[in-house]
Amino acid sequence: MNNIGIIGQGFVGTAIKEGMQHALTVDTYDKYKSELSTCNSVKELCKKTKIIFVCLPTPMKTDGSCDLSIVESTVEEINKHSNFHIAVIKSTVPPGTTERLNKTFKNVSVVFSPEFLTEANFLDDFKNQNRIIIGGPRPATTIVKNMFRKVFQEVTIVKTGSNTAETVKYFTNCFLATKVSFANEMKQICDEVNVDYDKVVEYGLYDKRIGRTHLSTPGPDGRGGFGGSCFPKDLNALIHVAKDNGVKPTVLQAVWEKNLEVRPERDWEKLKGRAVSKEN
């Protein structure tokens, strides 16, 4: 399949378009960005493509859980106009979401493929990614893998169950958030005992087990902790998943509490519809 569609032209959808249009025919639809859309509706997009990437917000509700309403309504719309399409969800969703959508909608095969982009360098991150993970039912995952292979000849592509693929995204984002909170606490300790934190990091990184990223404090934005549209909502979503399944998320909650301490401005709360639901 050489034609793909993309719903949503935020940084994820834009990265897919820019990174794949040299090898595939790409059509787009974004109800809020008509100037970036080649189609006027999901219905039109379905007529022109068979594989559709869903790149839409999954913001945090007031209780910390993941708001899936935008993704769910979009998959429902694809299903309505589908002639056995494949919907590839790039939005971060809790484990079990893809399975549930496949049970609910019969005209579309839903696959999950997490993105690992940074908002600051999303175009380069997409073009230079070192792994692609695809979770969901066969033959849809095989079709999606073959589609990706036309663009990324050398990249490792892994097919797995959708629950695993969904959890990998939370594992990655929440581990990196943990590093940020740890770094901020270490910086506080170093300041109190009159030790140069940057030197501690420099010498500590001689141990190759410690990754170099997410240890600078303040961070790239000049502030403590983590903010933006991803880490806060994803950490809280995983905390909510843990509690719902009888797991006490001691570490994750400590990460969040430290972040609230070192980033009191809570900039994510201003990102209505992206980091937090509009109801918040």
For every predicted segment, state its role.
Residues 1-280:
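Structural/interface elements that position substrates and couple domains in central-metabolism enzymes
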